Amino acid sequence: MKKLIFTLMAAAMTASSTAQSVDTESLSAYDQNVPIGWATIGEGVTGSNDENPVTVETREALIAALAGTTPKTIYVKGTILFTGLVSINGAQNKTVYGLPGAVLANPDHSTIKAESGILQLKNCKNIILRNLTFKGAGAYDMDGSDNLELQASTYIWVDHCDFQDGVDGNLDCNNGSDNICISWCRFHYLIAPWSGGSGGSNDHRYTNLWGGGDKNAAKDEGKLRTTFANCWWDEGCKERMPRIRFGQVHLLNCLYSSSVANYCVGGGYRSNAYIEKCAFTSNAAKKYPWKNYATSGTFNDYNYTITSCLGATDKQTRYGSIDYFIPSEKYSYESYDAALVQSVVSNSSNGAGATLKFTDPTAIQESASVADIVKVEYFSLDGSRLTMPRKGIAMQVVTKADGTKLTRKITLSK
C-alpha cells in the first residue's frame, strides 16, 4: 500500500487573482497592484491567474516552466545564471514571481554578441513578470542583446523589476509588441561602461529602446502601445528612457534622477509620447527631459506632450499630421502630484525595483482553515496536472469548502 510522506514544504495559495501571493500590506499607498493603462485594453493581462504553482532554481527549469500555453505560476528562487540570450517563443498565460533576492544574471563581459543578454519573450502573450532583478555585464556597444527583450509579444506586464547593467539595453521592445504595462521598475547602471565595441560608442548606457527602426512600420505602426508608471531611471542611465518609434507611450509618475543623462525621453519617427506628472530631479534630467530623435527626410513625424511635471515645463509639440496621443481618451487611470514622485518611487521599502514581499510557496506554513476538504489534485514539479499520484515528488493541491487552497510538496513511496 502506498503511503504519502509530506515534506511540509507548503503554502496556502488561491487562484483568484494575478496578485494573490503579494503581501499587500507592505505596498505603497499608490501601488494599485494590477496592470494599468494599455495592458488593460481589450483582453487584458491575467497571466496564470496564480494557477499551477512551481518553484524554479535553475535556468533549465525556468525555460521548461515558461514553455507552452498552459497557465503556470513560476516562483524564481535564488540566482539563475545565463551565458547568453534565452529566447522563449510562443509562451502564454504565465506569471513569474521573483521571490525576495531572486536574480537572473549574465555577469561575464564578452565581446561575442551571442554571449550577451538574458531573456527574450518572442511571440508571447499574457505574461506577467514581477519582482525579478536582471543583472547584465555592463553596457558595451556591439549590437548585442538586452537584459529583457519583448519581440512581437502582446499583453505583457512587467512590475517591480530591477534592471541593471544591460549590455545593449536594459529592457527593449519592438517588432509589433503591444498592450504593455511597465510599472514600478528601476533602471540603473552600477558597472562602468565598456569601451571599444564595434558600434562605436564608448558609453552605451542606453536603457530602453521602444521600436528598433524607422523602416519597420509594417510591424510597428499602430503597435508598441505602452504605459510606464512609477518607474525610476536612476544613476548611470545615459539615454533612451525610453527612446520611442511609432508607439503611443504614456509615462506617468516616473522619476528621472541620473546625473549623467544626455537626455531622458527620446522621440523618434512617428513617436507619440505623453509625459505626465513625472519628476526630473537631477540637473542633467532637467536640462533635457525630452529630445527629438526624428531623422531627416521622410522619417520626421513625431508628437510629444509634457504636462504637470516637476523639473520640466509644460509643452506640446509635433511635426507632421499625427493626432496627439491623450491617454485619458484611451483608458482610465489614477495619478498623484509630481511633487510626491521622488519620495514615493525611490522608497527603498516599497518603491520601484524588486521590493515586493511574498509568501514563499516552499516555506513551511500551516493552513488556518478548518473547513472540509472538497478536492485533492496532483501536479508534477513543472506544473502539469496528474490524473493520479505516482511514485516520486509532486505537488498536492487541497481545496477546502471555504475556497482555501493548500499546496504541499509531497513524496509518494511504497
Task: Go through the PLM ranges and name each one.
Residues 74, 96-98, 127-130, 156-159, ...:
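All-beta strand scaffolds that present successive hydrophobic residues in beta-strands
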Residues 81-220:
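Right-handed parallel beta-helix
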Residues 88, 103, 190-192, 201-276:
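Long, polar low-complexity repeats
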Residues 243-360:
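Extracellular beta-rich repeat passengers
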Residues 395-414:
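C-terminal tail/sorting-segment detector
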